[in-house]
């Protein structure tokens, strides 16, 4: 029997939709989706016990249960229901993909819109952030790319609060798994491409093709793609987009928007570039020459949504660094960065080597995540040994792997170079700080914005930036106490 969902839903008191039997709320409709690892049909009774008013499934065996409705395609039914319950979305949708740089770009985009007096928001690895609205949206899942239902719930709520611009990250996993559903966006961009997630995609070609689904499956015909011209595979990407009739523009040293000079320091950078035959200069507090293309991708995004370029550049110069992205801790020479891929780690280390004071040394603290791409561990060890003066290997998010074995795989890549191995990440950070001398720089890499450490199935509170701040504060207190003791002893 074919159901008219709109008519069917009128017969029930329905408060919302859910695809999770554990979090489904009373009077919500539960859609029993069959995923790669979990089948929602196995949890229909759980959903009903938790208060689901209806269950939609494409498994006929389950329809003997009261309140269970059979449909031929449960995903199509979900999409139809989403249009009924969460039809609204911000007028301008912008999506960003790439191995590294996604979080930075979506943040820069939303910040710049707000600086130009527009309400904007971004969704991604860091979470949801809203500019120009006091409403707080709770229960945002911690995924780079949300599933389609949660994305549309949030987009609907943002539109209800008059948010006009929404920028969001699109991961290769999310694209491959169809989490964007039928989402169509105005602008897409490609920040970078290098090895990552081979545990999932198996080959770099599969990984690249997964990312390109954003451009072929989710960009409106009237939309435009913005590409980093410095991507090694850029010619393949451009040919692929041409063959799929996707309009694009490139940014970079050889881009349509050409970066001609970057001058970096510990306090920011100046970027000279040419756009439409006009020479521009952008001064920013954002550290890292690799951020130049990210900033200009953000600039072009606003340009193609109708803003004047001069106004964009003026506003863009005021954007703030993103937490855990080359984050300089309280004016010290200690940096926290999310660089968890070989390419990102190499770029971060090269950048800091180039801007460190004369005579200073560069130390790096990092580990690798468990149950993730194992092939990058030795590569990252090799990169650290090549570009850092001191290497400290510690734990990242070991998950269900033996952390000692993860560290051993990293150390194999280091070869004959010297290193220090410290299991506890907190102790490794303290060790790195204790061994800093004047003009030295310390990079704490891999976790960035994360405020947890995953050990087994537990998320333990842990924040690199806060560990640094607390330890620096304790050192300051100790020094003050020592000064007080010395001064009190000299009083006659």
Swiss-Prot record:
Residue ranges of the motif Meso-diaminopimelate recognition motif = 396-399
Catalytic reactions of this protein: UDP-N-acetyl-alpha-D-muramoyl-L-alanyl-D-glutamate + meso-2,6-diaminopimelate + ATP = UDP-N-acetyl-alpha-D-muramoyl-L-alanyl-gamma-D-glutamyl-meso-2,6-diaminopimelate + ADP + phosphate + H(+)
The cysteines joined by S-S bonds are none
Which biological processes are named by the entry's GO terms?
A: cell division; cell wall organization; peptidoglycan biosynthetic process; regulation of cell shape
Q: What is its EC number?
A: 6.3.2.13
Q: Give binding positions for UDP-N-acetyl-alpha-D-muramoyl-L-alanyl-D-glutamate.
A: 21, 144-145, 171, 177, 179
Where is this protein localized, as stated in its record? Cytoplasm
Keyword 4Fe-4S belongs to the record: no
InterPro entries per UniProt = Mur-like_cat_sf, Mur_ligase_C, Mur_ligase_C_dom_sf, Mur_ligase_cen, Mur_ligase_N, MurE/MurF_N, UDP-N-AcMur-Glu-dNH2Pim_ligase
Modification sites for N6-carboxylysine: 211
* Cofactor(s) needed for function: Mg(2+)
Q: Where does ATP bind?
A: 98-104
Pfam families noted in UniProt: Mur_ligase, Mur_ligase_C, Mur_ligase_M
GO CC term (a single one): cytoplasm
- According to its UniProt record, in which pathway does this protein act? Cell wall biogenesis; peptidoglycan biosynthesis
Keyword Ribonucleoprotein annotated: no
Task: Specify the domain of life of the species encoding this protein.
Answer: Bacteria
Q: Could you state what the record's PTM comment says about this protein? A: Carboxylation is probably crucial for Mg(2+) binding and, consequently, for the gamma-phosphate positioning of ATP.
Q: Which keywords does UniProt give here?
A: ATP-binding, Cell cycle, Cell division, Cell shape, Cell wall biogenesis/degradation, Cytoplasm, Ligase, Magnesium, Nucleotide-binding, Peptidoglycan synthesis
Instruction: Tell me which residues bind meso-2,6-diaminopimelate.
Output: 372, 396-399, 446, 450
**Entry-linked SUPFAM superfamilies:** MurD-like peptide ligases, catalytic domain, MurD-like peptide ligases, peptide-binding domain, MurE/MurF N-terminal domain
- HAMAP family membership: MurE
- Protein family: Belongs to the MurCDEF family. MurE subfamily.
Role: Catalyzes the addition of meso-diaminopimelic acid to the nucleotide precursor UDP-N-acetylmuramoyl-L-alanyl-D-glutamate (UMAG) in the biosynthesis of bacterial cell-wall peptidoglycan.
Sorted alphabetically, which NCBIfam families does this protein's record hold? murE (TIGR01085), PRK00139.1-2 (NF001124), PRK00139.1-4 (NF001126)
Record's protein name: UDP-N-acetylmuramoyl-L-alanyl-D-glutamate--2,6-diaminopimelate ligase
Its taxonomic placement starts with:
Bacteria, Pseudomonadati, Pseudomonadota, Alphaproteobacteria, Rickettsiales
